């Protein structure tokens, strides 16, 4: 999993849900699959 400083792209399909949550919290990205990523196997 990438470090939380490496933000997800706005439409990136994330395998690191927490990375997306940090990015969203800091208004640096808005992954569409943040929630589904929690249950996704990469």
Swiss-Prot record:
Expressed by the venom gland. The keyword Disulfide bond applies. Inhibits tetrodotoxin-sensitive sodium channels by binding to site 3. It slows the inactivation, causes a prolongation of action potential duration resulting in repetitive firing in autonomic and motor nerve fibers. Does not depolarize the resting potential. Does not affect tetrodotoxin-resistant sodium channels. This lethal neurotoxin is active on both insect and mammalian voltage-gated sodium channels (Nav). This is Delta-hexatoxin-Iw1a. One of its GO terms (cellular component) is extracellular region. InterPro entries: Delta-hexatoxin. One of its GO terms (molecular function) is toxin activity. The presence of a 'disulfide through disulfide knot' structurally defines this protein as a knottin. Keywords: Disulfide bond, Ion channel impairing toxin, Knottin, Neurotoxin, Secreted, Toxin, Voltage-gated sodium channel impairing toxin. It comes from Illawarra wisharti. It is found in: Secreted. Disulfide bonds join 1-15, 8-20, 14-31, 16-42. Gene3D superfamilies: 4.10.40.10. Belongs to the neurotoxin 06 (delta-actx) family.
């Amino acid at each position: 999993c990438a470090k939380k400083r490496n933000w997800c792209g706005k439409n990136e399909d994330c395998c690191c849900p927490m990375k997306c949550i940090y990015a969203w919290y800091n208004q640096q990205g808005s992954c569409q699959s943040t929630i589904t990523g929690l249950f996704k196997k990469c």
